[in-house]
UniProtKB/Swiss-Prot annotation:
GO terms, biological process: gluconeogenesis; glucose 6-phosphate metabolic process; glycolytic process
Function: Catalyzes the reversible isomerization of glucose-6-phosphate to fructose-6-phosphate.
Reactions listed under catalytic activity: alpha-D-glucose 6-phosphate = beta-D-fructose 6-phosphate
Family: Belongs to the GPI family.
Active site per UniProt: E358, H389, K515
SUPFAM superfamilies named in the record: SIS domain
EC number: 5.3.1.9
GO molecular function terms attached to this record: carbohydrate derivative binding; glucose-6-phosphate isomerase activity; monosaccharide binding
Provenance organism: Mycobacterium leprae (strain TN)
Protein name: Glucose-6-phosphate isomerase
Highest taxon of source: Bacteria
Length: 554
């Protein structure tokens, strides 16, 4: 398909009309009633994918809903579009590119020919170079300019070059086994870099500059400041021993002073928000090693295969994406909460924000026509039980419908005894997981509360309406493979929703104009230049106030 081909309006299809009628029939039905009608739904509406046990029974759906949603997916040619993406067809139509993040985790002995090239060979060639480099780093064979071992890698990137590595580093911290830690710098606010470097020793620090073009403003600004910090301490000759690059621009990498032999490449068919399993993960491989990184990739591939081969009716990412669309377009939900009951997944919701919202936050379809329905779920969240003491009040008794994904693990990597010295803190954590999904679903009625002797005037305040939908995702333990499975589960949900909405989930034109405006305003803010075009009164006043407070003429 090219960007010029018209895309049928999914809201004008019989499948959409059937779902609308179905919503009229069951939209007001409470989860209490769904479970009363079918007490076994908690054992029926479940899927196991790899190490993930996914319970979607606490959603406001029936078996009929699932079938109608699958019919909608087929009306949107989801299976054909999925196969096209996996085969390397240019499904990113606005940029005329393949979308092949799934190729990053294909086994070495497979083959995928795209534009005459076996991309699997290319991927594993880079993985081999990454592995050889990180082996040297981890063993101490690679030393800094002073001869000392590297004990800290600082990843400088932004967006997909930062959010993924930050999240995975925290999630897999227990797998760090070579005495190397990582820090991550992304914000152009100088406070970020200053804080990250404040207690580091230049001689034991390695910088990874992650920028495909090696021209990203924030990344190059931070990298230049980091370079100055290093050379002030160790001299210019130290740059080649303390800087490596993840990029495709050899000329600019060389000009920066980085030996291009220490440049790790990737491809235009890897979007930033889908790149954590590419060379963008170099900092992670340095910390956890090539074997754990390979396990991470294998987890992605498990879910990729399921997404490719499982029937839509039992395809986990497809069903979860369809359920998200059900809430967004038929029940009026605007956001989805992601609630990991694992402190190691503290950055998972922030990672998913970019993955989902940059992908599907579009108002124009791939053929250039306006969308005719809501798109782009708003993702947000916090770890349990922290969120319970912050925003769960709104989830339980507020007026907004917020479907939530609960993620938990049976076996903790860390555990401690409870106050009595006997119980498990992890058991206490997970008892909250199960209790919250139960109360969100079933609530507590006024009659039940009154029967407990609650004063009549207090009863309305204690009613828990329930009927708040959740997905429960359980795994045995948070391992590299399980983390890869979780990420791929959400990647393919994004694709599913994007296909049905008819949008291009793999471009991000909405972030470009603000960058250009910032470039135009910088000389106005810092010097005496006049703006290229008349500023609106608000921006003009703000700029003048800023200049005055910076000691510049207004």
């Amino acid at each position: 398909m090219t960007s010029m081909q018209a895309i049928p309006d999914i809201t004008a299809t019989p499948a959409w009309d059937a779902l609308r009628r179905h919503h009229d029939e069951i939209g007001a039905t409470h989860l209490r009633q769904f479970f009363a009608d079918n007490p076994n739904r908690g054992r029926e509406l479940v899927i196991t994918v790899g190490d993930l046990y996914i319970d979607y029974s606490k959603h406001r759906i029936t078996h009929d809903t699932v079938q109608l949603l699958v019919d909608l997916a087929r009306a949107a040619n989801l299976e054909q579009r999925r196969d096209q993406m996996l085969a390397g067809v240019h499904v990113n139509t606005s940029e005329n590119r393949s979308v092949l993040h799934t190729a990053l985790r294909l086994p070495r002995d497979t083959e995928l020919i795209v534009d005459g090239q076996n991309v699997v060979q290319d991927v594993h060639a880079v993985l081999d170079v990454m592995g050889d480099f990180t082996d040297r780093l981890r063993s101490g064979e690679w030393t800094g300019a002073t001869g000392k071992r590297i004990n800290t890698v600082v990843n400088i990137g932004i967006g997909g070059s930062d959010l993924g590595p930050v999240m995975v580093y925290q999630a897999l911290r227990h797998y760090a086994d070579a005495g190397i830690s990582a820090r991550f710098v992304s914000n152009i606010d100088p406070a970020d870099l200053t804080a990250k470097l404040s207690d580091l020793e230049p001689g034991t620090t390695l910088f990874i500059v992650a920028s495909k073009t090696f021209s990203t403003l924030e990344t190059l600004t931070n990298a230049t400041a980091a370079r100055r910090w290093l050379t002030d301490a160790l001299g210019e000759a130290a740059v080649s021993k303390h800087f490596v690059a993840v990029s495709t621009n050899k000329r600019l990498v060389k000009d920066f002073g980085i030996n291009t032999a220490n440049m790790f490449g990737f491809w235009e068919w890897v979007g930033g928000r889908y790149s954590v399993d590419s060379a963008i993960g170099l900092s992670l491989m340095a910390v956890v090693g090539r074997e754990s990184f390979a396990d991470f990739l294998s987890g992605f591939h498990i879910v990729d295969q399921h997404f490719q081969n499982a029937p839509l009716e039992s395809n986990a990412p497809v069903l979860l994406g369809l359920i998200g669309l059900w809430y967004s377009d038929f029940l009026g939900a605007q956001s989805r909460a992601v609630l990991p009951y694992s402190n190691d997944l503290a950055r998972f919701a922030a990672y998913l924000q970019q993955l989902t919202m940059e992908s599907n936050g579009k108002s124009t379809r791939a053929d250039g026509t306006p969308v005719t329905t809501n798109t782009g779920e708003i993702y947000w969240g916090e770890t349990g039980t922290n969120g319970q003491h912050a925003f769960y009040q709104l989830l339980h008794q507020g007026t907004r419908l917020v479907p939530a994904d609960f993620i938990g693990f049976s076996q903790p990597i860390d555990d401690l005894p409870t106050v009595d010295g006997i119980g498990s803190m992890h058991d206490l954590l997970m008892s909250n997981f199960f209790a919250q999904t139960q109360v969100l679903a079933f609530g507590k009625t006024a009659e039940e509360i009154a029967a407990e002797g609650t004063p009549a005037e207090v009863v309305p305040h204690k009613v828990m309406p329930g009927n708040r939908p959740t997905t429960s995702i359980l795994a045995n333990r948070l391992t590299p493979s399980v983390l890869g499975q979780l990420i791929a589960l959400y990647e393919h949900q994004v694709f599913t929703e994007g296909v049905i909405w008819g949008i291009d989930s793999f471009d991000q034109w909405g972030v470009e104009l603000g960058k250009k405006q910032a470039e135009a305003l910088l000389p106005v803010i810092t010097g005496n230049a006049s703006p290229a075009q008349q500023l609106d009164s608000s921006t003009d006043t703000l700029v003048r106030r800023y200049r005055t407070e910076r000691g510049r003429t207004s």
